Structure formats: structure tokens, C-alpha cells
Amino acid sequence: MFAVMEIEGDPLSWYKLPGAVHEWLEAVGGFAILGLIIWLIFYIVNPPSTSQRKVGLSTGAWLTWSTLLAVLIGLSPIALAIIWDSLGLSDATEVRSTRASWTRHLNVPFVSTVMPASAAPKKDFLYFLYYLASCWAIAAVLVPFIVGVSRLRFRRIWGLAKLSFKEAIRRRVLWAFSALLLVFLFASWYLPHKPEDQVRGYVGVVSFVIQWLLVITASLLASFSIPTDMKNQTIHTVVTKPVERFEIVLGRFLGFTMLMTLVLVVMTVLSLIYVARGVVPEAKEESFKARIPVYGDLKVQSIKEGRVAEHGKSVGRESTYREYISGGVADEKATWIFRDLPSNFAGRATLPCEFGFDIFRTSKGKFENKGVQCKFTFMNWKCPAAADSREEAKLAQEFHQAAGAEQALHDFARDKGFYEIRGVEVVDYHTLAINVPGELFQDLAEWKKQKSDAPPLTVVVRLEDLSQLLGVAKYDLYLLEDPGEESFWQNFFKGAVGTWFHLCLIILLAVTFSTYLSGIISWVVTMVLYLGGVFVAFVRDVASGQTSGGGPMEAFVRISQGTNIVSPLDETAASVKLALEADRVMIFVLRRILNLIPDLARFDMTDYVAQGFNISLFFRDNSLALRTVLLIAYLLPWAVLAFYLMRSREVASSS
């Protein structure tokens, strides 16, 4: 039996890729403009002869003029907004802060403008100028990078990669962390023995141990490699040969990645054997699956102060992931609308519908340690009740009057497009299933042909028990395109690819920082970024000011004063003023560096394996191909930064 898996953010989808590329260009463009400004200051401060030796005269001239043009385009919206206001074309009483597109969506560093409200018709044009400036900055940075990449030769990179591979094997850090795996062998003593929990426990433990051991090992190897070579001056044997500086970076990255990939494959095989031997046969039969779900959109309706509200009730919990509906009220319901269904649903005798909800109890006694009763109503695109609650009640009455043989109910579902199940027991946070008659999907091909606006399937859930509340979320109910015939073993290896993504990310970060920083500083900065990615959701809430109780300094004041998070503070006190101002500065900085932090949750697929959901390779949401695109999009700017840092580094330095 599976528990309920919470999916906080929307899945990665191919149809969102164009918008993601647009936002990526704006975000990277903001950093590119900032980098060009820093480079220009460096170019002015240093004598021309020094700059020529480091980056070359032609590159310096190109970047200088590109920086000036990017800054000119980027600042033009501010000038236009000021001119627009000074000419009296705006209402001075209506002024609101409007951010550039990338800062508005992604909080990356550039500028904020004050634009008159009446200047809204010109706003899109001003955003276009910001977008143009960011794209130009990216092009300016990429031109020298592309020229440098054209000189690379794979034979030299491969030779450096093999050298890095051999050096890493000889280092003690690899074997020291491998020895910690002995502790991992005793983890089964502390894992749950109930069959329904075993697979989740074993998969979670092995994934956690493998990921953190390999990540720490890889970060140490990559962070100290180039600084150690520079300190020992062994890098001179490489740079004196016809080798590009960037080839050293790529060789290190490729060599360490190959080594950690080999270790990951071995550990994944051993972990799979460990899971297979440790799990009892009952758990294997029940949980060794790789199901393919089909999700719908959720619409919750409740009654608040005698009126119908298009949202659920709050039960006072800190998490807002789920909305709640009351039992015994016909107008309180949760509706899942499936706007597209796979063609292979047609022709099936039955189709599994799985669900797992939260139960909030308002009374104790006979309801404790028991489930609640729910009513499930299924309506296809031909059913008029899908858009009219009165028709739904009428059809429900006809349906239950026709109740008798199971085939009669299936015939009713085929003719009327309506099927209802009452008295379905729902257990708190446990995944259960009911079978939906395939007659509801017989005309699916006709629906696709007609391109009807009506959804092919609507599922309505109501709680029948009084004095109880049912918590629902979008991903709590789904149809199964495949009930789990996909191999669990294949899914386990696909889940390990998520750990490989983590390794690629941290190796490139460490190598990039090590091109200009000492070994220990490179490792600290790399781990700070990585740990920020682990807690990126919390960091995002802090940066947006959505955390309860204020920022870090305000929270410290509340703890020291023994004040809860909802009580107002005395803002006239000097300590409170200082804390609030410190939080404003911290939030300002966090907003500007937020896009530097990787969203590691996007690469973690442990829950999918543990909860028995298939990890798609290419065409579905959250596929490995989509995650690979996301990884490349994050690593590419860091690779460009490593290119410039390595070219500007004085190799003779012993620091």
C-alpha cells in the first residue's frame, strides 16, 4: 500500500518550455549585464597591457562596446518613463512600482523602475527594451566563448579527463567516504517492518545515503584539484603544452564525472540487491510497481457564511497544500476536471482511479481510528450533469433506481455518461483505488474528433460523514494509464539518474569556483549553494517575505522575547528597528541571488520510485529529458563563467 505523495509545485511540462526559455534568457541576461559592468570596471582599472595579456585586445574592445550598449539599452526604459512623466502625460497621483520582466518573475539583479500608472500602454515596449538588453548581453558574453570553444579538441580534453580520473582514484577522500558505507549496512535494523512501509523506507534510506556520500566526495575532489595543482605548480606541465585553458576545466569535469558515475552505478546495483533482499514478499507484490498516472485540474467548492465559495475551508494548519470540504453538505465538493485523456483508455473494461486524502476530525469517539465515507461521481463529456448540479442530482436518482446487476450500471454509464459510487471508505493518508467502468471512455475517439470544449471526464468527490472534513489537493486523485506493469527495477535505475544530476551540478560548480578561489573557499561556496538548493523553497519564501514571523532577524528577536509569530512587535524599540532593517537588507540580497541557487527538488526522483510512480524518459511531464534540459540550462552559465575565470587566472600564482 502506498502513502499519499505531495507534489508541491507543478510538474515540468514540454508545453511550458517556450515560456521557461524566455524567462531563462531574461534571468541570465540580467546576470550577464552585471558581469559585463564588473568586467568593464576591471578593464578600466587595469592597464591596457595587462588586460591584453589576459583576455586579448580584440576581446577587450568587443566586450567594452557591448557593455556600453547593453547598459544603454537597459537604462533607456528608466529615461523614457521619466520623460513620459515630465511631459505631463501621466497622472502624478497614481504611481506604482513596476519591475523589469526578469525581476518581476525571477528576482534576478538589475533594476527597478517607477513607472506612472497611466504609462501602462507603453509598459510592454519598455519590457521589450529590457529583454533586448539582456539578450544583447548574453550575445556579447557568448561570442568570445564560442570562439574559444571552436579551438577545443576532444583528444586533449579526453587526455586531461583520464589524468583527472587516475589522480582522483589515488586520493584518500574517495576511499574514506566509501568506508562509511559499512554503517549503511546496519540501516535495516531501524527500518519499518510493516509491508506497506518497507519499500518506502528502504528506497528512501539508500537514496539518501548514496546521494550525500557521493555529493560530498565529488565536491571535495573537484574543489581541491586545480588549486592543488597550482600550489604544487604541476599545472605548468599542462599549460606549457598546446592546451586551451578551458580544456583543463572540461577535462577535470569530465574525469570526475566519469569516476563518480562509475561509483554511482556500482552503489545503485548494490542498493537494488539490498532492497530486494530486505523487503518481504508481501511488500514486493504490493509496492514493486511503476504506475503511470493521469492528473486533472482541481476545483474546490465550499459554503462560507451561507454563500458558495470557490475555494476550500481552512482548518488552521500551517500548510496550505490541501483545501477542506465539510461532510454531509451537497454543495461542498471537490471536482477534478480531466481535460485530456490518452486514447488507449477507450476499449478497456475498467480503469483504476486511485486517491488518497487527508481527514480532519472535529469530533472524537466512534470516528477515531476509522475511515470516512465518500461519494464519487464520474461524468463524461456527453453528460449534461457535468455542468449542472440539478441534472447531476436527477441522474444520480435514476442511476440508483437502475441499480441491480453490475452490467445494468455499466450500460447506464455508456448511455448517460454517468456513474456513481457511494459509501467508499477513505483512510487518512492512504492510497486506495476504485474501478471506473470502461463504458465512460468508449466514445473518447469521437470526443477527440469533434474537439469538444467539454472535458472528457469530470470526477466529483463529496464527504458523506457529518462533523468531519476532507482535505484534497490536485494530485490526490488520478487515473492510471498503466497500473504498474512497468519494471520497478528500471524505475529504480532511472531514479538514480537524479543523483547523477546532483553530481554533475556540484562537480561543475566546484571546478568553476576552484579556477579562481583556493580549495577550501571553493568547497565552502559550493556547499553553501548546494545547501541553499536543498532549502530553496524556504529561501524563496524568505526572499518574498512570505514566512510567518518575518525574516531571520525578526525571528531571532521573537525567540529572545518569547513572542509568538502572530503577536505584533513594538516597532519603536531600537532592537526591533535594527532587526527589521537587517531583514530588509537580507531580503534585498536574497532576491538578487535567488536564481544562483539550484532547485534541487527538480532533480530528486526518490519519491517517485518509493511511491511506485513511473519516471518517464521523454514525452511526459517530469521526464528525464526535461530534467536534463533544466540541468543544462543551469550549468551553461556556470561553464561560461569558468571559461572567463580560467582565462584571467594567473597560473603562476601559488595561492
Could you say what each language-model-derived stretch is?
Residues 3, 7, 146-159, 482-486, ...:
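Short, membrane-interfacial amphipathic segments enriched in basic
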Residues 169-177, 213-214, 245-272, 508:
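Selective transmembrane-helix segments that form parts of the transport pathway or gating/packing helices
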Residues 206-228, 263, 267:
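Long, hydrophobic alpha-helical segments
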Residues 166-179, 520-525:
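Membrane-interface helix starts
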Residues 521, 530, 648-655:
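Short cytosolic juxtamembrane segments of multi-pass membrane proteins
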Residues 56, 161-165, 169, 226-255, ...:
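Helix-loop-helix units of permease transmembrane domains in multi-pass membrane transporters
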Residues 151-174:
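Aromatic- and glycine-rich beta-strand/loop motifs that create alpha-glucan
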Residues 2-52, 74-133, 191-197, 278-485, ...:
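Terminal transmembrane helical anchor/hairpin motif
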